[in-house]
Amino acid sequence: MDIKRTILIVALAIVTYVGVLKWNQDYGQAAMPTQNVAASNTAPGIPDTAAGNNGSASADVPSATGNTTSAAPLETPAVASKDLIHVKTDVLDLAIDPVGGDVVQLRLPLYPRRQDRPDVPFQLFDNGGERTFLAQSGLTGTNGPDARASGRPVYSSAQKSYQLADGQDSMVVELKFSENGVNYIKRFTFKRGLYDLVMTYVVDNQSAQPWAGNLFAQLKRDASSDPSSTTATGTATYLGAALWTAAEPYKKVSMKDIDKGQIKENVQGGWVAWLQHYFVTAWIPDHNVTNAVQTRKDSQGNYIIGFTSPTLSVAPGAQGETTATLYAGPKSQAVLKELSPGLELTVDYGFLWFIAQPIFWLLQHIHAILGNWGWSIIVLTMLIKGLFFPLSAASYKSMARMRAVAPKLAVLKEQHGDDRQKMSQAMMELYKKEKINPLGGCLPILVQMPVFLSLYWVLLESVEMRQAPWILWITDLSIKDPFFILPIIMGATMFIQQRLNPTPPDPMQAKVMKMMPIIFTFFFLWFPAGLVLYWVVNNTLSIAQQAYITRKIGAATKKAAA
């Protein structure tokens, strides 16, 4: 039994760490590193021109054909960009390029880039010199202005700056362009407290000819690293594209997949998205039409995922509209679920999602009462421990009985010496006589590992944990303990637990078991502090429970002997 238990513990330790590394392989970013820019002493503003693009909007624009299953890239010549149009709400701070009307800059005022600089918001979109990430949209096809050989349309706006005023619930920003008797309005509608904005094209055809075009919307990103990633050494979250299909509500498309060639799907409704740590950006088309979804690389090597809608036809003297929604913000499951089916799955809890989702649901409800994620994790641990109390109690009783028969095991070892077969047979007979389950001590470990891994992914993926403080030196539960105090405490609790367990009769096994607290402490040094907190509390409760059961059985044994 002892060798089996030792092997199991070592194997689970290895599986845990390999599982984390496997997560890194499957979900981790395969991006090229970029130079990190230190935060300035003043909160930076959005620049007035789209730097890095030389003031141009020379992106690869998809062309629409009669068959919407194909959308080949079309090179458009560079057009000098005018000053950007700035828009600010209570949750968004963005800039729109008049050339094409793309959202080229976007910051999240409620999410600081660094915890020690709350005045510097996290920047989601950037079309500057360091990296490229923006949301593009336009009208292509037969008469679409974005398909012109002369370049994308240059829109005008009544103002250069828009801000949602106090008491104002919504705000509309309109961009206008006219050509060949056709008037175009590109309208952005913002609402207080929302990270999604509605983009509407109004085509007013005052020409003598019918107008036909296709709406396209896409997300363009280079291969730079994830600026929102705060994970530890050996771990990472998924950085890449994803889309919805009827057969697969959450289909990831990595940069490597896009490198292999274009991916094309005909999808009714759905969404296309770009995922990174804690945040997601998604274009959501009209759910009532079938759109051509595709991924590709443009001429500059940027990765693109987007869709092209069916042809919109507008007769002379008539108006036509087409709409899409852009979401750019945190991975809030409740909000994403309301926006579009399957979008909440971008909060990726891995293969143990069926355990992780209930854990997060319970954790949220506890936090609603306590208001602190650290204390919420402690209460959650106590509830989980209470749930498995009967199973743990049976296991600890088995280990207590084994500790009581340890002297008898020593006698058997002296009797049978190096004859392992006879020793094993004698041990099993003794266990049967004493009514001991030789594998009983392994059950708590087996039960805890899925919960442990699920909580790890909850802490890693849930934006609610980002920069969430507990007490004293733990100012962010989503990253490692800066002073490694919790991992050391965790190692100490493991050592105390070992003292309560029966010593393996094999000296080699005993040495391996003594090394386990050191090995686990090393693993936990870089784990999120919230996860280590869970393990510390769990171990502490286990020690109390095991000590109580051991004393109780010891007292009963002495009473029976008397």
UniProtKB/Swiss-Prot annotation:
InterPro entries linked to this entry: Membr_insert_YidC, Membr_insert_YidC_N, YidC/ALB3/OXA1/COX18, YidC/Oxa/ALB_C, YidC_ALB_C, YidC_periplasmic_sf
Cross-referenced CDD domains: 5TM_YidC_Alb3, EcYidC-like_peri
Name the UniProt record assigns to this protein: Membrane protein insertase YidC
Pfam families on file: 60KD_IMP, YidC_periplas
This protein's UniProt keywords: Cell inner membrane, Cell membrane, Chaperone, Membrane, Protein transport, Transmembrane, Transmembrane helix, Transport
GO MF, one example: membrane insertase activity
Cellular component annotations (GO), alphabetically ordered: plasma membrane
Gene: yidC
Subcellular location: Cell inner membrane
Family per similarity comment: Belongs to the OXA1/ALB3/YidC family. Type 1 subfamily.
Subunit structure: Interacts with the Sec translocase complex via SecD. Specifically interacts with transmembrane segments of nascent integral membrane proteins during membrane integration.
Biological processes per GO annotation: protein insertion into membrane; protein transport
Transmembrane intervals: 1-21, 343-363, 369-389, 439-459, 470-490, 517-537
